[in-house]
Amino acid sequence: MPASSRIMTLPRWTALAVLAIAVILLLAPTPEGWEPKVLRGAALILFAMGFFATGVIPEFVTGLAFFAVASLIAVAPADVIFAGWSSTALWLTFGGLIVGIAVTRTGLGGRLAARLTGLFGETYKAQVAAMILVGVALSFVMPSTMGRVILLVPIALALADRLGFAEGRNGRYGLVMAVACGTWMPAVAILPANVPNMVLAGTAETLYGLHFTYGAYLLLHFPIIGVFKAIAIYFAVLMLFPDRAEGSTAKTAHTTPMTRDEKVLSYVLVITLALWALDFWHGISPAWVALSAGVVCLLPGIDLVSKDDFMTRFNTASVIYIAAVLSVAAIIVDSGVGRELAARILPLLPLDPATPATNFATLIGLGSVTGILATAPSVPAVLPPFAQDLATATGFPLVTVLMTFVLGYSTMFLPYQVPPLVVAIQLGGVSLRKAGRFTLLLAALTILFLLPLSFLWWRFLGYLP
């Protein structure tokens, strides 16, 4: 066994402490007046969220362990334990992963990225803008954030080489951070574009029967945390990573004709986007649209994703992880853990129906702090079970409370909160220190400018009193 595998790091010590506390809760006698399943549920939830947050074992292993332990200790009925598997969020992810494979395999993603970057000038500032725009544009057609990162970071590095930005140059770091944040942060405003959005949609449906529509979600979030956040990323890159191009940018657009597979996938994506945008009219969930698009990609004769591609490249681990996170939310409610925690947390928050601005800031702060403690993907699993109590305390509609969680997990402070961002900076050779300075600056810009704008926009749309 390598020596490094035996070193007890802070995450491993934390996971060990979490496991010990979970076992104590599981074996402890039930306090008077409590239902026995409250402590069992608390132990299971602490184990799952603690191990998801520390990452000492792969997330899918934690997810499978969660399902196994939940079934063994009978913490809830089977339909609650496995509620995540029947959620539309899970199947939206499933279909999106298949489409993501097709976008990469056919080369359409690379063609789209190259053509978009070729529309801009040869200066550093222009290419930073191009990288952000490509990241946002791909968010509409490629649901996987990790897929967008893996596709675009190599393009950013190739552009850096053409512009004369060698290792260690600010320009190289700037292009990588433009891609890393441009593929994640504005995409939070697009419902099917990342995992936390899909988890939130799934928990809202599982817990409250609420269905988010693509168009309404886009209208609420995209003008501010989509468009204005992209602009903030642009200026943050130029502030922290100023540089000037030295090389000559080659034309990046593909000159070869589109292949048959690229054309077919283009038609599939256009139809999929149209159905997503018009879901308020036809009433079909984005999940079933995404799943149908994935099935079309797999059909014999179309073969945008071959059997071998599906078997070797489909990210089953992500599906298991999302199912587990959604089921955690269901158990928080069914076991009574949510009620017990809410009864103790809510009195500590400065919530009053007479102070909507304070309530708005407090709910966003709650989401942001949760993201720091448990990473951004955990926020839509941890907080939604408390949403009804928070709605009562603030006087906000339930959907408004749920939407504030989006602003919470989109306001990230450190790179570790978002796994795709960590992957991007590793692929791009950006140190955690440099990336951390960037995300802190972006968080400050968000708090000072974008969140107040969001408050005004939400009030204009009628989401806030």
Label each PLM-derived region with a short phrase.
Residues 33-43, 86-98, 148-149, 224-227, ...:
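Structural signature of hydrophobic alpha-helical transmembrane segments
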Residues 61, 82-110, 136-137, 141, ...:
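Core transmembrane alpha-helical segments of multi-pass membrane transporters/permeases
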Residues 31-39, 46-64, 81, 259-263, ...:
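Flexible hinge motifs at transmembrane-helix junctions and intramembrane kinks/re-entrant loops
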Residues 50-58, 134-144, 181-191, 275-281, ...:
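Transmembrane alpha-helix interface/packing and boundary motifs in multi-pass membrane proteins
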Residues 66-67, 113-114, 146-161, 176-177, ...:
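Re-entrant/interfacial helical elements at transmembrane boundaries that shape
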Residues 2-28, 145-148, 166-173, 177-181, ...:
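Juxtamembrane and boundary regions of transmembrane helices in multi-pass small-molecule transporters
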Residues 120-155, 351-394, 398-407:
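Hydrophobic alpha-helical transmembrane segments of multi-pass integral membrane proteins
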Residues 74-75, 105-108, 118-123, 159-172, ...:
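Juxtamembrane helix-boundary/capping and inter-helix hinge elements in multi-pass membrane proteins
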